[in-house]
Amino acid sequence: LKNQWIDARTLIKTSNQFLESKVNWEATNNEINRIINQNITYVSQGFIGANQMGETTTLGREGSDFTAAIFAWCLDSNEVIIWKDVDGLLNADPKYFNRTKVLKSISFKEAIELSYLGASVIHQNTIKPLENKNIPLSIRSFINTNNSGSYIKEIVESKEKITSLIYKPNQVLLSISTRDYSFIFEEHISEIFSIFSKIGLKVHLMQNSALSFSVCGIISNKSLLILVAELQKNYIVKYNDKVNLLTIRNFKNLEIPKSLKNQEILIQQRSRTTIRYVLK
């Protein structure tokens, strides 16, 4: 197959945030459509771009998949195919659960929900530009190439949905309250999130009450101690490390899977479609 090499850094223009750069969509779209000839097959890199100075930047988690979505959005592609080491988008991680199922066809909306809740195969950054232009996304296995994989596109969801289990181990649970036991207001939460952002806590779950604000997320052990010390300047802080976050999407009952039943429930949240547990 004849092809032509092109450096992604000449096409994908980003901000100066080197580890999780923001794409300058207008500049990127202009460069890609100025340079790319759609009659030629190109080979390029994923994960990287360049800032205005031409310095290399990276696109963050799942940046290579995101690169494919960027090219597709700019070129108004008919479809994006991403090759993985799994048979498609699974309803649970086989490292933690038996009898997993491939989600053969789901909507962009459901894929974004699963990604937000912690599903690890596809990041929401990849899905969003494809949804904006209604470009279908196919997830295929480079090991089982005859497998049809998963298809994410704009479809009407059936009423009977497959239950998905998302398990995130080694999280930290923080419970934060004011020193004078006054109510937790918006200004407190704003200050708390500013500290989270500065020190690097990735929040996966939040729960608010009148007197306390609890979050479950992931952070390194070293940064956790720094975070707690910073919060304790103005707040009372309690925390549990090495907790696990279980999310059940499209649940059919409220039972925790048997393999996790010996764990203590620290937090339980429930909506119409999703139930979440913080377990210890």
Predicted regions and their residues:
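Generic hydrophobic/aromatic pocket-lining and core-packing "Φ" positions
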Residues: 68-69, 127, 193
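Flexible loop/turn segments at secondary-structure boundaries
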Residues: 13, 50-52, 89-90, 145-148, ...
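A conserved active-site cap/scaffold subdomain adjacent to cofactor or substrate pockets
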Residues: 105-153, 158-161, 169-171
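A conserved regulatory-domain signal marking ACT and ACT-like small-molecule sensing domains
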Residues: 148-280
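Nucleotide/pyrophosphate-binding catalytic subdomain
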Residues: 1-119
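Electropositive, surface-exposed helix/loop patches at the edges of structured domains
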Residues: 36-51, 114-138, 175-189, 239-259
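Fold-independent oxyanion-binding glycine-rich loops
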Residues: 7-10, 44-48, 61-63, 71-75, ...
